[in-house]
Amino acid sequence: INCTAYDNHVKGLGGGFGFQSQNADGMRAVVSNCIAWGNTCRDDDYGTGNANIRYGNAQTDGELPNRVTINVVCVPENTVSASAITSDPMFVDAANGNFRLAEGSPCIDAGDDPAIEGYDTDLDGNARIFGAAVDLGPYEVNDGSAIETAETNGGEIVRVQYYTMQGIEVTSPSVSGLY
């Protein structure tokens, strides 16, 4: 739930997410609000999906595809879910490990809110949900945050963000004075 798999290269199934079972009895897997982008895996004669999300069950009852639930995801090829987002997720700086979503990303406010029940914060500890719906991936975009900079007596620059007691970021605080 709410994860990103990026630029993985494997010899087995699914560079992003891969599911294989010799006996699928009782197995259930759910992929929801995730981004799988730029992953590769070997070509094989069995399996369903693509290099980013792939599942197969050689020598089983053929039920593995029925036991893997793919909810809202962002993948380059729409072969795993009718609701898949296939546009570039627009990471801030994937080359340097920043997988936060940039402004204009199709993954912002595109997730399945019920899937995150019980998970109130993102990987940075910021409140989920910010906006119309949960974002895909591990980071929630907090657009338009109220950020101020101030110079202290020592000449240091301080960044200030405002939050409610519930941890919700305030985008337009109406406060003044020294604290």
Which residues does each predicted region cover?
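Short, surface-exposed loop/turn motifs with a glycine/proline- and acidic-biased composition
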Residues: 160-179
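Residue-level detector of functionally pivotal "anchor" positions at catalytic/ligand-binding pockets or at interdomain
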Residues: 81, 140-166
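Active-site and glycan-interaction determinants of carbohydrate-active enzymes
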Residues: 80, 100-136
